Swiss-Prot record:
Disulfide bonds: none annotated. This is Nucleobase-ascorbate transporter 6. It is a multi-pass membrane protein. It comes from the Eukaryota. Signal peptide: none annotated. One of its GO terms (molecular function) is transmembrane transporter activity.
Amino acid sequence: MAGGGAPAPKADEPQPHPPKDQLPNISYCITSPPPWPEAILLGFQHYLVMLGTTVLIPTALVPQMGGGYEEKAKVIQTILFVAGINTLLQTLFGTRLPAVVGASYTFVPTTISIILSGRFSDTSNPIDRFERIMRATQGALIVASTLQMILGFSGLWRNVVRFLSPISAVPLVGLVGFGLYEFGFPGVAKCIEIGLPELLILVFVSQYLPHVIKSGKNVFDRFAVIFAVVIVWIYAHLLTVGGAYNGAAPTTQTSCRTDRAGIIGAAPWIRVPWPFQWGAPSFDAGEAFAMMMASFVALVESTGAFVAVSRYASATMLPPSILSRGIGWQGVAILISGLFGTGAGSSVSVENAGLLALTRVGSRRVVQIAAGFMIFFSILGKFGAVFASIPAPIIAALYCLFFAYVGAGGLSFLQFCNLNSFRTKFILGFSVFLGLSIPQYFNEYTAIKGYGPVHTGARWFNDMVNVPFSSEPFVAGSVAFFLDNTLHKKDSSIRKDRGKHWWDKFRSFKGDTRSEEFYSLPFNLNKYFPSV
């Protein structure tokens, strides 16, 4: 060609898929609710999905505290009640995303550390011991909540996340989902004859059946969780009443049986949880510092979860001020958890973020309806306990799909990055590898020795180091964030490689008109609490 120019591309030459600020093909976004009957069913699905964590955390903690079935049932009710309140607060005044805020596994190691501390060994009565430990956990959570409230409401976290780019969001959001792999198939395998059918039916109903039976109403993919859970729950109940587990080992019976008479029998018919129901909180400086570090880890993880939720709700990237506001209200959620005595702090539910992807419904109203179900079934204890008795392998099968969706949501931000850049490859590969490898070392060491790699005489200091390095998204996100903001950042071509130019318009609340549509406060509160 004359002049040495490159030939014009042919019309049929393959072109890359164009990057999208908002995820296309979503049926209902934040501000477009589905019809009421459909919204109520979808809200009930969200309630079913968040039950897994709600039951697993008290199951792990309450027996170690000294509590029995009655205390466990009360803690489950309390977690449900608090989750309903916190979800409403987050959807109304926080980020306003359809994010469920429930109990978090991140706080469990610190709570276990409080349980194992020697200061409760002099209490012989197990119920008294349970209440003393719960009051100590309450005190630690109340103090720890101040960290997120200060960072969020002061705008300090806003200044941090302004440096977040698509390349550093990939490891953070990706491992928020993929980092929870231990709760997936290992949980399914605890009762493979129930867990595996649930996983297969869920995939078939949600992915294959809509293409076989084209109803045009998205019934199967939208309500796949209800279909799959009901079918396998009935099947599991038939196995239970048929005597399939009568001679099985106790662990098998716990995982497989549907007649958990203990939790259903112990749950009261009607009970409204109230603040300080276990007594006045007690405070210990070391435990408060350890819980504060767990709160900071939950803050980082929830930042990634909020980004994933915004993607699957077909919203634009959150402006830093909105993300900071959401973190502030998550601090309020931890405070409420401490006041009511849930045994663990609160963070964004990753499994419910994955459910948004499965249903393709990112409506705020649906999640608010789910919050109503949480509060309703927490007060009517017997009915809530029936749903809480769903075998854990069924819930673990749901996790296999939902955590995968959230991880894939993190990978989707690669569309904004230059994948032909060696800088990009190094940051992505190194951060993801360390995000998997470092927590593996810490968790493996703890499983073998019974304590973490950092093992000094100060238990609170051990927790402050061991907890963050046991979190995959915290390690991966921190490494990626540091490298992305220190490695040849001033080079002009690097900015495009990072994908930062795609998010420039979302640096401030008024930088894009869509931000007001998705994230503005209700009741004209933006006039009094303006976002920047």
